[in-house]
Each structure stands twice: as C-alpha cells, then as structure tokens.
Amino acid sequence: MEENIAALEGGVSCRAVATGMAAITLVMHLFKPGDHIIAGDDIYGGTYRLFADVFTKWGITFSFVKMGDVETVRSAITPETKAIWIETPSNPLLNLVDIKAVTKIASEAGSEIITIADNTFCSPYLQRPIEYGVDIVLHSTTKYLNGHSDVVGGCVVSRTEELAERVAYNSNALGLGCSPFDAWLVLRGIKTLGPRMEAHQRGAMALAQMLDAHPNVEHVYYPGLESHPDHELAKRQQDGFGGMLSFDVKEGRAAAEKVMLNSKLFLLAESLGGVESLIEYPESMSHASMTMEARRAAGITEKTVRVSVGIENPEDLVADMKQALDS
C-alpha cells in the first residue's frame, strides 16, 4: 500500500499510520519548540484543534491566515517559520490555495521552510501537490483512498529521501503504524479510486448546479461552478473538481438542520469520501472544536452545511436534496 500511494503521489516514500490525525501528528514531530508554522484559517477543525490546543503547549506557534492570498502568506513568514501547511480545497468551504505560488514563496524565503499539503479532499487522482513543489503530502486514508467507510487510517508521503528517513524514524518511535489488515483494505479501495472519483464529481456537479439555482440556498461552495472565485485555479491545478461541496441555507440554523434531517439519501455523519453520500453541520460537528470567533473569521456560519457526495445516481441525489430544501 505504501509503495502504491507513493507512486500515485510521485513521492519517494510513503509511511502508513493508524489514522489521519496520526499522520498530522507524525508530521508535526518534525518540529521543535520555538518553531512557527503558517496554516489556513479555514482548515479542518480537527487539525485546527491539534495545532491550537495541543502543539501550542509544546511551544510551537501558528499563524492562521487567508491562504488564498499569497501576499498574506508571504507577510506571515518570520525568521522562526519552519513550515507552511496547505489544505486545498479547504474543509469545509472549498477555498483553494495556489500550491505552486506558495511553494515558490517558501523556497524564496529559505531552505528551512518546508511545505506540507493535506490532499485528502482531492486524492492523487485529482491533484498531486508534489508536482508543484510540495515537500510532504498527507492523507486520511479513511476517506477517498479507501472509499468504503470501513477503515480508519492515514499516510505521509515524502518528496525527498532525507524527509522520508525522518518521517519513518518518528513513526517507528511513536508507534503510529497502520495495521496490515487496514492496509490491505485501503489497497483494495485504491483499485477503484478512478471510477469512484469520476462518479463522486459527476454527482457533486449536478448537486451544486441545483443548489446554485434553488431559492432557499444563499451560497454554494464548489470549485466546479464558474461562479466560484477559484474556478480557474481549480482547472489549472486539479484534474477535476471533486466530490465535496458546502452550501449556506438562507434561513439559518433551524432551516439547515431541517434540510439535514429531511434528506433521505444523505446520511448525517461527519466523515467523507465513501461511496455513500453524507451530510453534516460544521458548526456543531466537524468544526465544533474551533471557537465561534475562529469559525466566523473563516466564513463558517450557522447556515453552512457540508456534503460528501457519494456514487449514487446524480438524479436521485438532486431529487432528494431538492425535496429536503422544499419541505
């Protein structure tokens, strides 16, 4: 499995670990007290929690910035900066980061700054950050790489042998390894990654177009829509627009909760990337560990609903979401 994922991402080595959060934890052990890391203000809530509530206690500092603005990223660099953490598209608002521009900024600022990309939302089928100069790519293999919602796992892919050796040493020292059976299941899932991703994004595009035209929807976050501010970047940087989307319901929390409870094909669950469609509420689920102030600064509101589009018939998904919005 490790060889397979390393080849898919174009890295020299992959290290499989027990969970996606274990992959992030493993990467974070490359740093020491006093180091500074730049990350997006709209990243996954679990990542934000680990950074803000755990690693800050170790003396590592973080700047959470608008990663879509490369000048903002550049201005956040300090003499202590050792890494730039990229999550693109971001979770849950599907904001994109210009990977090539950020890696260029990092290289210009000094050889000590490494770039790290969480590629879970796209999978290597749609995006390969190492091609744009990223040093480390990580995944929650629980999601698209496995694709069947029956595994918990993660992995770290390194661009250089030097980084690969450090990652492997830390993984062994920390005891973060993935079980052989889970690795076998992920490898099974990877065999259908291509057809699954094509089905995911067909359904996501159909759903996004319906939501974009629905009177009860205020805004749709999906890079496949031409109205998305990063649509052109997505066309350049990705090989497709993916199966994740979010939208804001006009009438606020009560209406958003009603949509989630009234949908019949979308299971209420926080995970993503499986063959079944899921719906969740970032305000109290995936991003509940962020402070309200941090959520609002990132653009996450009580109106926001996140959807992981499965591989079901797009017409069925559209019809079900429409009846949930209309009810």
Where are the regions a protein language model picked out?
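Conserved PLP-enzyme active-site core in the AAT-like
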Residues: S13-N216, Y221
